[in-house]
């Protein structure tokens, strides 16, 4: 299994603090059935800047350590890029990393809103052959209040990744319920851990897949995990036609 969003590289952001933490996370990932991780340290979020060369070097060093420790896990380079207006230009300058050098780019919104220029930026990126993958949209306040924002971005070609912990209920029942509504509306294309450590931000991969199978049957979790394989091969992912999210006041978000 492939995890496309994880903060396993040591001392690069708010994820693994050192190489010992990285090894501990690697062992936890393997226990969850994960064999490949795309390391996605935060980049340009106002706190962290992790340049491509540094990410590649850190991934190489961690892979050497994993071999030494006999841990059956391989780490690939990527970034979780906080959205900003010059993403397209900086990709052209090779100043940003896509996910393992594929056409897929992991883009993070601020947690409280969706920038108004996002739609135009995503359009421009797609003209250049890239596919923006929206990181954890379920945790964005404006999307929770107005999920049609996500619907319109997905309708126009973006993909999105939900966090395993959200589906597993780690962030609360309301966020779990909202996450399931996004899945139900065909607005989610990947499940990933966004793991930062093994104590407070663990993988929860198997829990999430269990929830998905219980709610929607076995075909959906298979499709979402297969999409990670397709991404890694730089191929077109599976998609179902997106639908508007059902408005249920029960969830407390709208």
From Swiss-Prot:
Gene3D superfamilies noted in UniProt: Metal-dependent hydrolases (3.20.20.140)
Reaction it catalyzes: O-phospho-L-tyrosyl-[protein] + H2O = L-tyrosyl-[protein] + phosphate
Keywords tagged on the record: Hydrolase, Manganese, Protein phosphatase
EC number per UniProt: 3.1.3.48
InterPro entries in the cross-refs: Caps_polysacc_synth_CpsB/CapC (IPR016667), Pol/histidinol_Pase-like (IPR016195)
Function: Dephosphorylates the phosphotyrosine-containing proteins YwqD, YwqF and Ssb.
Effect of mutating residue 136 to A: Large decrease in activity
Effect upon mutating residue 5 to A: Large decrease in activity
Official protein name in the record: Tyrosine-protein phosphatase YwqE
PANTHER family documented for this protein: TYROSINE-PROTEIN PHOSPHATASE YWQE
Keyword Hydrolase: yes
UniProt keyword annotation of Chloroplast present: no
GO MF assignments: manganese ion binding; protein tyrosine phosphatase activity
Signal sequence residues: none
Lineage summary: Bacteria, Bacillati, Bacillota, Bacilli, Bacillales
pH behavior: Optimally active at alkaline pHs. Activity increases with increasing pHs.
Description of how activity is regulated: Inhibited by vanadate and sodium pyrophosphate. Not inhibited by sodium fluoride.
Known cofactor(s): Mn(2+)
Domain of life: Bacteria
Species annotation: Bacillus subtilis (strain 168)
Pfam families for the chain: CpsB_CapC (PF19567)
Family membership noted in the UniProt record: Belongs to the metallo-dependent hydrolases superfamily. CpsB/CapC family.
């Amino acid at each position: 299994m492939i995890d496309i969003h994880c903060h396993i590289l040591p001392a690069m952001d708010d994820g693994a603090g050192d190489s010992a933490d990285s090894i501990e996370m690697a062992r936890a990932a393997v226990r969850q059935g994960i064999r490949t991780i795309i390391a996605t340290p935060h980049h340009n979020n106002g706190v962290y800047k992790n340049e491509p060369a540094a990410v590649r070097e850190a991934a190489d060093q961690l892979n050497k350590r994993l071999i030494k420790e006999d841990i059956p896990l391989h780490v690939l380079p990527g970034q979780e890029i906080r959205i900003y207006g010059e993403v397209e230009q900086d990709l052209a300058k090779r100043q940003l990393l896509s996910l393992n050098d594929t056409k897929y780019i992991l883009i993070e919104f601020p947690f409280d809103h969706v920038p108004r220029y996002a739609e135009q930026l995503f359009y421009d990126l797609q003209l250049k052959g890239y596919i923006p993958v929206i990181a954890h949209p379920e945790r964005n306040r404006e999307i929770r209040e107005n999920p049609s924002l996500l619907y319109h971005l997905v309708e126009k070609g973006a993909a999105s990744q939900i966090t395993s912990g959200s589906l597993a209920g780690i962030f609360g029942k309301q966020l779990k319920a909202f996450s399931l509504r996004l899945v139900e509306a065909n607005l989610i294309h990947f499940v990933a851990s966004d793991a930062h450590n093994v104590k407070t931000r663990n993988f929860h991969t198997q829990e999430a897949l269990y929830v998905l199978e219980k709610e929607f049957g076995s075909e959906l979790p298979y499709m979402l995990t297969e999409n990670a394989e397709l991404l890694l091969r730089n191929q077109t992912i599976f998609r179902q036609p997106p639908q508007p999210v059902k408005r249920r006041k029960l969830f407390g978000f709208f």
